[in-house]
């Protein structure tokens, strides 16, 4: 701005000097020289105006570009969530590691039911979940091969010494097959995987829990609705090694997730059921997330009602309300 002001001051000084000289020529009766100076001043003035208009136009273009960039920064959340599910967002990480399931920390997790002797109904719950692409297109179908790891913990932070009441570990391997359906473009993929789940405990207190599943799932995105059904088959174990023989009775053979993905919030509903009318068991979970600071960190509310929230409680009915923060979806 200081340089512009000095330049304009110099221009005004030169213009005033030329104008004074033209007036002197008029007084002397030399109208020809006076007109030449007036013409020269007019050309200079028009040149300055053109330069100013070009400068204003350039500034306007820069401002519009800046606004466009800012608008592009806020992307459609529904496509971000789908990209995360399909593993398309890992290019932002040089190691190719990306989030898999929800990653959250819920310091306020209250159970309306007893959690056993000497356990506080109030605790913290958190989950870490990542995936890594290994390779792709071995079959010529544009398929992608992944390993993934999810850990969910229930932490008695309000008790003396703050022990971990339960931790579930879920390593898995899966293959994503893209679907190219001309008339059904909302069908995005077919996923086939094998999943191990364990609480990492020994048999000394009869608290060991583990099982293995083969599953198939797909993701269906229609406008801002995301639908993810998943079916599984439990890999059989011998009676000697099976430490939770009735787990299918409480967990069933499927779950479905239905989510509405707004611009800065999401609502997700998870349903699971054994489809037995005479002895029905299952679970429902409702997730609400709102991007408070517009930076990808969500205020997160989770409500669970049913069986199988954790392996240690898979055969116990629990109702829980939890809140905290979610950092990826």
Named regions from a protein language model:
Residues 318-329:
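Outer-membrane beta-barrel "beta-signal"
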């Amino acid at each position: 701005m200081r340089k512009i002001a000095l330049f304009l001051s110099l221009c005004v000084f030169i213009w005033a000097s030329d104008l004074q000289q033209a007036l002197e020529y008029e007084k002397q009766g030399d109208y020809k020289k006076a007109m030449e100076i007036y013409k020269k001043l007019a050309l200079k003035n028009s040149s300055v105006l053109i330069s100013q208009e070009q400068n204003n136009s350039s500034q306007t273009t820069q401002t519009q570009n800046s606004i466009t960039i800012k608008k592009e920064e806020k992307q459609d959340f529904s496509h971000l969530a789908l990209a995360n599910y399909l593993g398309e967002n890992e290019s932002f990480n040089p190691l190719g590691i990306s989030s898999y399931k929800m990653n959250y920390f819920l310091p306020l997790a209250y159970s309306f039911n007893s959690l056993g002797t000497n356990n506080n109904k109030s605790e913290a719950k958190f989950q870490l979940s990542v995936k890594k692409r290994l390779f792709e297109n071995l079959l010529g179908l544009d398929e992608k091969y992944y390993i993934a790891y999810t850990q969910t913990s229930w932490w008695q932070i309000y008790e003396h010494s703050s022990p971990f009441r339960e931790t579930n570990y879920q390593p898995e391997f899966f293959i994503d097959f893209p679907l190219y359906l001309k008339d059904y473009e909302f069908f995005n993929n077919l996923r086939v995987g094998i999943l191990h789940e364990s609480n990492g405990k020994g048999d000394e207190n009869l608290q060991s829990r583990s099982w293995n599943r083969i599953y198939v799932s797909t993701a269906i995105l229609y406008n801002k609705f995301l639908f993810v059904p998943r079916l599984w088959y439990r890999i059989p174990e011998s009676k000697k090694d099976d430490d939770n023989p009735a787990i299918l009775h409480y967990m069933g053979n499927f779950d479905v997730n239905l989510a509405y993905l707004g611009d800065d919030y999401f609502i997700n509903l998870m349903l699971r059921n054994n489809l037995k009318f005479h002895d029905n068991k299952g679970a429902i979970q409702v997730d609400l997330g709102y991007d408070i600071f517009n930076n990808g960190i969500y205020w997160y509310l989770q409500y669970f009602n049913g069986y199988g929230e954790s392996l240690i409680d898979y055969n116990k009915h629990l109702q829980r309300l939890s809140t905290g923060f979610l950092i990826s979806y």
